[in-house]
Amino acid sequence: MQQGWLSNWLVKHEVVHRSLGFDHRGIETLQIKAGDWDSIAVILYVYGYNYLRSQCAYDVAPGGSLASVYHLTRIQYGIDNPEEVCIKVFAQKDNPRIPSVFWIWRSADFQERESYDMVGISYDNHPRLKRILMPESWIGWPLRKDYITPNFYEIQDAH
């Protein structure tokens, strides 16, 4: 599989990762181990990836793992030619823990909270990791493939 310049740079510096190829826009996707994510995130920030475009999470497969996905941007040669990379960090469902990157990219705040709320990934060292969309009393993680929808009845306004 063809590797991009970032993957080659990480190999040169003996940083453990796996290239997952390129998307339709030519953006390389890298898989990083959860235990290595905080140090690799610092490396990427120092190297110029100072903008977290988006972060999301998804359930890979029933009984499988969960993924936290980060889209990072580096603007080196002008705003018309940004360099982007996609990082996927996987965690097991039985103990889904990933280091938070809030302290590197502040825009991760609400995005990691939403991923926690919907998928159940705990982001270590996040300053305000609590539900953001669902009530605090909600049980379960609504976007997991094994989620069972609770029985509830809609209360309608009489007007």
Swiss-Prot record:
GO terms for biological process: photosynthesis, light reaction. GO terms for molecular function: NADH dehydrogenase (ubiquinone) activity; quinone binding. This is NAD(P)H-quinone oxidoreductase subunit J, chloroplastic. The gene is ndhJ. The lineage of its organism: Eukaryota, Viridiplantae, Streptophyta, Embryophyta, Tracheophyta. It comes from the Eukaryota. Belongs to the complex I 30 kDa subunit family. NDH shuttles electrons from NAD(P)H:plastoquinone, via FMN and iron-sulfur (Fe-S) centers, to quinones in the photosynthetic chain and possibly in a chloroplast respiratory chain. The immediate electron acceptor for the enzyme in this species is believed to be plastoquinone. Couples the redox reaction to proton translocation, and thus conserves the redox energy in a proton gradient. It is found in: Plastid, Chloroplast thylakoid membrane. It is a peripheral membrane protein. One of its GO terms (cellular component) is chloroplast thylakoid membrane. NCBIfam families: PRK12494.1 (NF009141). Its main location: plastid. Keywords: Chloroplast, Membrane, NAD, NADP, Plastid, Plastoquinone, Quinone, Thylakoid, Translocase, Transport. NDH is composed of at least 16 different subunits, 5 of which are encoded in the nucleus. PANTHER family: NADH DEHYDROGENASE [UBIQUINONE] IRON-SULFUR PROTEIN 3, MITOCHONDRIAL, NADH DEHYDROGENASE UBIQUINONE IRON-SULFUR PROTEIN 3. Pfam families: Complex1_30kDa. Its EC number is 7.1.1.-. InterPro entries: NADH_DH_suC (IPR010218), NADH_quin_OxRdtase_su_C/D-like (IPR037232), NADH_UbQ_OxRdtase_30kDa_su (IPR001268), NADH_UbQ_OxRdtase_CS (IPR020396). It catalyses: a plastoquinone + NADH + (n+1) H(+)(in) = a plastoquinol + NAD(+) + n H(+)(out); a plastoquinone + NADPH + (n+1) H(+)(in) = a plastoquinol + NADP(+) + n H(+)(out).
